[in-house]
Structures are given as structure tokens and as C-alpha cells.
Amino acid sequence: MGSSKSKPKDPSQRRRSLEPPDSTHHGGFPASQTPNKTAAPDTHRTPSRSFGTVATEPKLFGGFNTSDTVTSPQRAGALAGGVTTFVALYDYESRTETDLSFKKGERLQIVNNTEGDWWLAHSLTTGQTGYIPSNYVAPSDSIQAEEWYFGKITRRESERLLLNPENPRGTFLVRESETTKGAYCLSVSDFDNAKGLNVKHYKIRKLDSGGFYITSRTQFSSLQQLVAYYSKHADGLCHRLTNVCPTSKPQTQGLAKDAWEIPRESLRLEVKLGQGCFGEVWMGTWNGTTRVAIKTLKPGTMSPEAFLQEAQVMKKLRHEKLVQLYAVVSEEPIYIVTEYMSKGSLLDFLKGEMGKYLRLPQLVDMAAQIASGMAYVERMNYVHRDLRAANILVGENLVCKVADFGLARLIEDNEYTARQGAKFPIKWTAPEAALYGRFTIKSDVWSFGILLTELTTKGRVPYPGMVNREVLDQVERGYRMPCPPECPESLHDLMCQCWRKDPEERPTFEYLQAFLEDYLGILAWTPWEDKQEGPRGETASNKQERPGEDTLAADES
């Protein structure tokens, strides 16, 4: 595994210097033509929430319901009403004969959006017609179509994106406020000797007349004009806006239209990534076009009928911190096709070369991401049953996603179902689940506490020196693992809350996510790849003074 610097080497990542039009405005202005959203100060932080896909009734074009949610986690936002012409946010290469290839910026007429996540569209550029992923487009001339608009991402996620050391000062994005519906926030990367890389968040307020402003002395009729102005003038910001924050293409919802139960021949197994008691994991390609991960299960591991029934539920779980289930081969040997995560399992990542460079802020951030995914599982009334570092996958920029949720329930191996054999993860399992088979979201919380020890010890096996039977006996008598070396007591206290004997006294994942994100906020953020210099070689000796720095109040809460 190489460095986690995220250089945009391919067209799937978007970075560009901003060259705005001359649209400076001062004083009052008429209302913007962008969707009317009531902006309010982003005054304080609240625990972040998941943004899974909202199910809606199918509808023919003629109009959009403004309560719809764009499924891309980094381009979320309400679709504009009455719009049938959309613009492409990313390049897309067709994967099947019925798909439509298109380029970023291409305008598309939507013909039919009643068939789920893949819409029938007609390109106004090429004249061709085919199916497109709905989260790759946005209504033409809307704020959702702006490259700098990231919609409904959390404050923490915006910081994760902006704190990439490759980003120069002034890299920015505009997002929805977490605290006030319809409000916006401008998030800007900065650098100084005291804090190193950091992010400033500025409230974007709304005028009664419909305009927008950060400071009342400089007002704009639209967010586009506000961004254009501050790309030329810092005017009280920490730095003028320079580059739009780079981001990768989102995952499509499924491989293609109607690609769920797929033929085994459509998959090519290329690189073996790992092997476990019940099968193997491969990097591979679907249909000769799409990189995927493929989990192959040994015959007899689980009933194909039970698996297919469970998979129908699993594919409906959609969250940016869950590994997306793409497709299945439902006849034995069962194949499970998911999105590919480039850095492999969290356990291998922690124990590998990159693990030694991880500091407490990165570890807490990874834990918060996992808690975010599990908070969604909690809200959906689902249970993972096998939460541990081996079942968390890592991507670029230390993105973590929960994998293999729900599969443990289906395993039919006698040694596993007895819950005592070597194949069963006793050390991660809550006592009521290990002894009596009572698996609930609260037993997942117990497992999360064990996972926290894996993070803080860089992948050490829990309960070192103890065998499974001894662990079960000792835990039943009240033993809990002591605080790992170099782990703050406050984090160990959180682990102990997860290990309370009464499941109902354990915290929720919603609480765990909020605690970890708030805890991360009080840590001095150490950027991935610890550097002594600022972005793009800016050091204390060559850093120039920034006139008017921080004359506008950034929301640091």
C-alpha cells in the first residue's frame, strides 16, 4: 500500500482552479434564481447524521418532488421542481449495451425516471439514448450542478476532504448547514504555524430579499456570485477561494440497470486479496468494464435461498460508510459482488506499513466513520453480528466502510453455529450473544468497543494471552480489558460503556458517533502524512502575511 496522498491522477477526481466571472456586488440585490433556501447561521455543531437514499414513489417526468434526495453522498441536495434537462457532474463510460456514455458538463434530457436509480436519458450532445446513473447528474442551472456545491455532507466530512495535504490554501466547498435546514456554510482550507492545516467554516446568511452574504457590507444575489467574488478577494476570509475541493466519482447504485442476479461468466477474478474460513476475497472485473470486489463462499457455507432473501434486504442498505452490495451469483458457489476498496481490510491496514504512521486523530476519525455507518444500521433496525476490524474496509484518504453486515446469521457451519469453535469470533462477541445467541444492535455496540481496542493497538488481537473459553469465563465474572498503552482514559471509558453487562445500558451508535466526532474536534488534527511544511511547500520562512486574515468570524465550534 502506498501513500494516502490523494493526487487526482485520473478523471474520476475533480480539481480545478477557480477562474470566476466578474460578478462582484455590494449592497442589496433581487432574489437569486437558485432554489429558494432559507439560510441561517451555522452557529453550533450537532452530531452528524447519515444521508442514505430516501425512498420515494416512482414518478414520470413533468416535475420533481423537491423532497427527493440525490443519492450521491457528496452531491446530495433537493432536485429542482419542474426540471427535465440535467447536466452531467462526472464522466461515465457505459457498462452494458443499454447504458449511455456521457462526459462531464454534457446536457441530458430525462425521458423516464420511474425505474429506480437508473434513468432513461437522451443526450443533447450526442443524440444517443440510454440508461444513466441518477446520482451522476443534477438539474441544469441549479446550485446542485455547481462543482463547488457538496450539498448534504457533514462538517466533519468536509474537513476530511479539505485537509488533504495536496490541497493549497483556499481550497473550498459550499455545503448545507447541519444545524439549520436550508442554510449554507462555506468551508475553506487554511494553514498557519500554530494550527498547521486547518479548516475555517463561514456562515452564509440570507437576506429577506433573497440575497446572500457572509458579512452585511458585501451582499450577492446568488451563491454563484458570492463564490465568484471571494475567489478574487479574501475580504476578511482566511484566504481567497482558490481551488474547488477535489472529490472522486460516487459509487453508482448497482452495477447497471437490472444487474442484480448476474451470471458467473460476467465476472473475472484477477487478484486474490484474502482468504478466510468460509471463502476468498478477490479483486475482479464485471462485464469487462467495472472494477469490483468479489467474495466467493465455499459450497455449504449457507443456504443459497436464505442468502438471496437476506441479500434483498442488504442491497437496500445504502450509506456512505457501508460497503455497497452491487450484485450476487446466487447458485453455489455463491459470489457476493461489492464496491472495491483499494486499501483492503482495516486489520491489515493497521498492522501494515501505513499503520505505524497513524496518530490518535486519524484513529479516532476512523472510529467515528465506522460509528456513522453503524448508526445508520441502527436506524434501519438491522444487526451486523460480526463487527471487527477484519470486516471494515479502507479506501483512499483513510475512508472506512463497514462490510459483511448480516452475513454471519446465515452461516451453517457446525463449528461456527456452536459459538465455541475456533471459527467463531468469541473475543469480539457480547456475552449474551456468545452464550445464548441473543444478537442485537447492542451486541454490535459491545463488538465496537472491542474494535476500538484494535484501532488503538494497531491491530493487536483482543485479550492477549487468553484463549476463547478463558475470555468467555473471565468476561462473565466481570473482567474487562485494561486501557491500552497510549490510549486516552476518556476513550477507554467509552470502551467500558460499550462493555456494560446489561445490553440496554450500552450507548447507541448515534451517541458513539457524536462522542467520537466531538472528541476529534478537541484533538489537534494531524494531517495524514505528517508534514512540517504547509500546502504546496509553504513553510514558516516563505509564508507571506495575509492582510485582513480572519477579520470575518469563522465558526470554529
From Swiss-Prot:
Give the SH2 domain ranges: 148-245
Q: Which residues form the active site?
A: D386
Q: Which domain of life is it from?
A: Viruses
Q: Which residues bind ATP?
A: L273, G274, Q275, G276, C277, F278, G279, E280, V281, K295
Q: Where is the SH3 domain?
A: 81-142
SMART domains, per database record: SH2, SH3, TyrKc
**What positions are modified (Phosphotyrosine)?**
Y416
Q: Please indicate if the UniProt record lists GTP-binding as a keyword.
A: no
What EC number(s) has UniProt assigned to this enzyme? 2.7.10.2
Cystine residue pairs: none
Spell out the post-translational modification annotation for this entry: The phosphorylated form is termed pp60v-src.
Q: Which UniProt keywords apply?
A: ATP-binding, Kinase, Lipoprotein, Myristate, Nucleotide-binding, Oncogene, Phosphoprotein, SH2 domain, SH3 domain, Transferase, Tyrosine-protein kinase
The Protein kinase domain covers 267-520
Catalyzed reactions per annotation: L-tyrosyl-[protein] + ATP = O-phospho-L-tyrosyl-[protein] + ADP + H(+)
PANTHER family cross-referenced by the UniProt entry: TYROSINE-PROTEIN KINASE
- Entry's family note: Belongs to the protein kinase superfamily. Tyr protein kinase family. SRC subfamily.
Report the protein name in the record: Tyrosine-protein kinase transforming protein Src
Q: What is the lineage of its organism?
A: Viruses, Riboviria, Pararnavirae, Artverviricota, Revtraviricetes
